[in-house]
From Swiss-Prot:
It holds the Pfam family Indigoidine_A. Keywords: Glycosidase, Hydrolase, Lyase, Manganese, Metal-binding. Belongs to the pseudouridine-5'-phosphate glycosidase family. This is Pseudouridine-5'-phosphate glycosidase. Substrate binds at residues 86, 106, 140-142. GO terms for cellular component: cytoplasm. It comes from Geobacillus kaustophilus (strain HTA426). Its cofactor is Mn(2+). It comes from the Bacteria. The active site is at 25 (proton donor), 159 (nucleophile). It catalyses: D-ribose 5-phosphate + uracil = psi-UMP + H2O. The gene is psuG.
Amino acid sequence: MNDFLVFSEEVAQAKAEKKPIVALESTIISHGMPYPENVQTAKDVERIIRDRGAVPATIAIFNEKIKIGLTEGELEQLGTSHDVEKVSRRDLPYVVAMKKHGATTVAGTMICAEMAGIRVFATGGIGGVHRGAEQTMDISADLQELARTNVAVVCAGAKSILDLGLTLEYLETHGVPVIGYQTDVLPAFYSRTSPFRVDYRLDSAKEIAQFLETKWKLGLNGGVVIANPVPKEEELEESYITAIIEQALKEAEKQHITGKSVTPFLLDRVKTLTGGKSLQANIALVKNNAALAADLARELS
């Protein structure tokens, strides 16, 4: 057993009883949404997973330990503190060794989930290749993690502030399958559609579970992107959100915002420019992904 892992009572019991478990990231709480919506969404997502017969395991770093499953107090702390680090692969040893509090990104959560023996993870959207990456080389560590870590990631596609075409090219190069759940095209986070096709369409959690079992039994390491479109009633029109993202990107460039700060800045500007509609879509798609992830975890267990 990894000395750095600490399981909540609920998750430890689920592991002992071989119950289905769904990993959840924590940067969505610390950096992805404003308070109090962030903490409320985290609680709602955990409830949805429980209601569908699985056990939620929100992951974060506290006091030199990787916590697999958080208390309500810890969720609150992540949602209100201003000194929580974003933790991806490179940051994990620093945050643990220096006894800092950390919220795990998609990549960070995948690493910790695999350490904990959890194979299904629900999030909002994965990171990817940023627009203008030909010059900046700004490519999310999430993509490398998907190529090497055996965790299935249920998401609403890549965040639409990214270059979706190049993100798909990168995933293809690294052998990461992109499955569309009941869709032939890649959802673009806030929108159900984009100009890009997924690799394979599968229409049930059972089919996706069969795909995953086969991939890993073949000894093919790496994750899978399971792209689940935002619910129709909450989606934002593709052309509408694209124009707003373009404006936010120009503002980020003008203000010389780079690196880790780009995504939180863009999400915040998009929220303001849509009058809060993007936040509502974000909350809806995270809940939708949690439901599918719970169904998938049940099929795999």
